[in-house]
Amino acid sequence: MDDKSMARGRKAFVTGFPIKHSRSPLIHGFWLKELGIDGSYEAVEVKPEDFSSFAASLAANGFAGGNVTIPHKEAAYAAAESLDEAACAIGAVNTLWLENGRLCGGNTDAYGFAANLDASAPGWDKADRALVLGAGGASRAVVHALLSRGVCHVSVVNRTLSRAEELAAHFGARVYAHGWDEAQALVSNAGLIVNTTALGMSGHGEGQDFPIDLTCAPKEAVATDIVYVPLRTAFLNKAEKAGLKTVDGLGMLLHQAVPGFERWFGQRPQVTQALREHILADMAKAGAL
């Protein structure tokens, strides 16, 4: 039996609360059509208080697995009977699947972050030092990716220093916590600068100047933002003006979807320019560029 026959009729999902904004159905729908797989991928809105029962009934509802987004990533971590290495390190699950009747959880955010940089800024992991702006949930995946790829020194900057200290303590050696007032000084020797804050994204001061001068960064430094709405954030605009190589956050969204699709439907999809343009067209239609 070939892979397409095995995947026939398989169902997968993305769940969050709210979920109508998700572009995951567009991504997976594109791949299902491209690969000629007779499967489906749907958005399912689940309230936080209902998540445990939803996760427990995946098989009964005919799902092979699915993606989990805000606010359910920690609840999915708790619900999974088995976790992959990335999920254990990050403390959150964004991908669920069933294996011999057991609910398994993984985290593909770190993979997506690194794969996006591999595609758009090859050699980025030669940087000895990285600067991560923000210490929220998303920054954990970024730090895990950086450590996994051998970055020697990761500085995490946050307005609330205790959040950065908590993250540094979680990962241990090679991760250092700093207050926001130290960010400017840290830019000068950072080979990779990652923005994980909401500054400059839609509804969070878009159009305003990013509050850090990037002109003192090494000329070979790479600047990347995990935000993809808007596509060109205030941070990326400022980095570009400073002459730095910039990588937007859309690629992370596309690449993080690859491992889950392969698990549920049995074929590994490709992140192509055609897929990117498909998502950009939807973003333009929604006024999200």
Swiss-Prot record:
An annotated GO cellular component: cytosol
GO BP: amino acid biosynthetic process; aromatic amino acid family biosynthetic process; chorismate biosynthetic process; shikimate metabolic process
Family annotation (CDD domains): NAD_bind_Shikimate_DH
Pathway membership, UniProt: Metabolic intermediate biosynthesis; chorismate biosynthesis; chorismate from D-erythrose 4-phosphate and phosphoenolpyruvate: step 4/7
The protein's enzyme class: oxidoreductase
Protein known as: Shikimate dehydrogenase (NADP(+))
Organism field: Brucella canis (strain ATCC 23365 / NCTC 10854 / RM-666)
Classification via InterPro entries: Aminoacid_DH-like_N_sf, NAD(P)-bd_dom_sf, SDH_C, Shikimate_DH, Shikimate_DH-bd_N, Shikimate_DH_fam, Shikm_DH/Glu-tRNA_Rdtase
Keywords: Amino-acid biosynthesis, Aromatic amino acid biosynthesis, NADP, Oxidoreductase
E.C. number(s) listed in UniProt: 1.1.1.25
